[in-house]
Amino acid sequence: MEKRDKGSSPMATMMGSRDENEDVENTTRTAETMLRLVPMALCVSALVVMLKNTQTNDYGSLSYSDLGAFRYLVHVNGICAGYSLLSAVIVAMPRASTMPRAWAFFLLDQVLTYVILAAGTVSTEVLYLASKGDTTITWSEACVSFGGFCHKALISIVITFVVVICYAALSLLSSYKLFSKYDSPVLTYPGKGIEIATFHG
């Protein structure tokens, strides 16, 4: 009588496939968690650099709080840091993904990507005006007198744009996870030629 190889049994194959899927999910979860923690650290760095950005000399005193764009940059970096930490904790939890959760990550990642991009863009414009000046709006070249202030502002803005890149990557990831896992089934009404896409959790 020919002996059956236990390793090739359907049950063993199923268990092996399940273990492999769990390993892949754990690896993916760890990678996404780290990807969400990186912008948190960057946001805190940009925030701290800008908060400490004050210079006083013979020409007077200048602080980040004197410029609305830089205040906005600080607030947005704080919000993004908090969201990054919260989302990293949620992703790190070993629980099955659901449709509402996938949609929440997708929408929040998209919104914060544009918010942090706007903060970086507006701050860049203000820093450019401080460096080059603009005679039409009587804006002098402040960086000539406050070089240290402008240098710290530049560092904070550069870090912020690195955060933008991280959030763009997160947006792509959350988009892929949502639309690859949850297809939109189409309901067709006979005789009317009407198709409606529906989602199920």
Curated annotation (Swiss-Prot):
Homodimer and heterodimers. It is found in: Cell membrane. The keyword Cell membrane applies. It is a multi-pass membrane protein. Residues 1-30, 94-101, 174-201 are cytoplasmic. It comes from the Eukaryota. GO terms for cellular component: plasma membrane. Residues 52-72, 123-152 are extracellular. Belongs to the Casparian strip membrane proteins (CASP) family. NCBIfam families: A_tha_TIGR01569 (TIGR01569). The chain crosses the membrane at residues 31-51, 73-93, 102-122, 153-173. PANTHER family: CASP-LIKE PROTEIN 2A1, CASP-LIKE PROTEIN 4A4. This is CASP-like protein 2A1. The keyword Transmembrane helix applies. Keywords: Cell membrane, Membrane, Transmembrane, Transmembrane helix. Residues 1-27 are annotated as: Disordered. Its main location: membrane.
